A protein has these predicted regions:
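N-terminal export signals
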Residues: 5-29
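Short glycine- and hydrophobic/aromatic-rich loop-to-beta-strand nucleating segment
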Residues: 128-129, 242-245, 249-250
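Conserved C-terminal helix/tail region of periplasmic/extracytoplasmic solute-binding proteins
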Residues: 335-411
Length: 411
């Protein structure tokens, strides 16, 4: 053995590490006992602004810091996101809140595959866009007579969301119903992947859509639509996207899950430093991520809202990634989601809400990861939540589901 190889070998031994001033157990980026079980992790994302914390953790080396060799895979639709996580082609994924529940329960065409939510990626920052031909409509109540007239003429209006059990579907249903419009009876509701929304509105395939940024502002920039409302006006600091894993992967790789969460904590803090947002917008605007002009991404990231109908404002409730206890996976939100599945007939009869929520929402991973980072966690779960039209009590989701005049309750 030559001298160079001997030194390399010695460096790998406990004595060699000690001689070099490194603690025994140190594995380069983490103590060996804390090293992730699986170091190669493939992340699925969709071309939306709220993929930012996953992308920036990759770009800034935060995944690497915690022993994760990350690969980012941009997918074409939420169905592909679900399927690749289900099949193990991706190990962690950018996902709509609601999708892990649908997969765990086998709802709406999802194969049964238990999934877990240990981390909320972001809050706020989605919107509903209407075609410019509807300018003048400011509320769902304004829209109702137009919807009714079209229905009577056998020219039913069409609205798009991104995935049936997901956030955009629920926000669109919630908004339409607030104006007395039944999303299952009065209009046609279709599924379109986020990056394809603007192109489909250009060819008059729909009258409106609900999606995340930057596609609402892109519709304004392209001169085809305007923002009638944002989702934060329905529910301030609502949950939006999550970082999801299959239950099987999380059970086998708990240290990997925690390493991912630690990296996301750092990237989320980085993004919520507003001085970093211009550079973040530039990074995520790349063709390999969102493929959209950085200026269109940045405006609403900064809370600068031009609604495209003459209304402009600085919205204090812009998209957040870390602030205001953003990342905590609160069970309250799971109960709300299940109440909406119930309201819209996606499940039949009362559900075992607690059993389902406890299985999917996993604050234990979050709490352990933050404790290991020395980060103090705050916030109280299972508290009433105020929405635009009332208060949700997570302790009685069945009563809440039955409280709406517009519904599709089944069983």
């Amino acid at each position: 053995m030559n001298r160079r190889n001997a030194l390399k070998t010695m460096a790998l031994t406990p004595l060699g590490r000690l001689a070099a001033g490194l603690p025994i157990g140190w594995a380069g980026t983490a103590y060996a006992s804390d090293a992730p079980e699986t170091s190669d992790v493939r992340f699925g994302i969709i071309a939306l602004t709220d993929c930012a914390s996953i992308v920036m953790a990759h770009e800034l080396g935060f995944f690497k810091k915690f022993g994760i060799n990350s690969v980012i895979s941009k997918e074409a639709s939420w169905a592909v996101i679900r399927d690749k996580l289900t099949l193990g082609e991706n190990h962690a994924t950018h996902m709509l809140f609601g999708m892990p529940f649908a997969s765990s329960m086998g709802l709406l065409g999802s194969p049964v595959k238990p999934m877990v939510i240990p981390w909320l990626l972001n809050r706020n920052g989605q919107a509903i866009t209407l075609s410019n031909k509807l300018k003048g409509v400011k509320t769902a109540k304004d829209l109702k007579p137009i919807v009714d007239k079209a229905k009577a003429a056998n020219e039913t209006m069409t609205f798009a969301m991104t995935f049936p059990p997901g956030t955009h579907a629920m926000w669109l249903r919630y908004w339409l119903a607030s104006g007395g419009i039944h999303p299952d009876k009065d209009i046609s509701l279709i599924t379109i992947p986020p990056p394809q929304m603007v192109a489909n509105m250009k060819i008059n395939k729909m009258d409106g859509f609900c999606v995340g940024e930057p596609w609402n502002l892109r519709a304004i920039s392209d001169g085809i639509g305007y923002t009638v409302t944002t989702t934060q006006k329905m529910w301030v600091d609502h949950p939006e996207k999550v970082c999801a894993f299959t239950e099987e992967f999380a059970n086998k790789n708990p240290k990997t899950v925690k390493a991912v969460l630690k990296a996301l904590h750092l990237s989320s803090q980085h993004i919520d430093n507003m001085g970093n947002r211009p550079a973040v917008a530039e990074t995520i605007s790349k063709a390999s991520y969102i493929n959209c002009q950085k200026e269109i991404i940045l405006d609403r990231l900064k809370g600068v809202y031009d609604y495209g109908n003459g209304v402009k404002e600085q919205d204090p409730n812009y998209m957040i990634f870390s602030n205001r206890n953003c990342n905590a996976p609160m069970k309250t939100y799971g109960y709300w989601w299940l109440s909406q599945f119930r309201r819209w007939g996606m499940v039949k009869g009362p559900q075992n809400y607690k059993q389902i929520v406890d299985k999917v929402i996993r604050p234990d991973y979050y709490m352990e990861a933050m404790k290991e980072l020395g980060v103090k966690t705050t916030g109280t779960d299972m508290q009433p939540v105020k929405l635009a039209d009332g208060t949700f009590n997570p302790n009685d989701p069945e009563k809440y589901a039955k409280s709406f005049p517009v519904h599709s309750l089944a069983g």
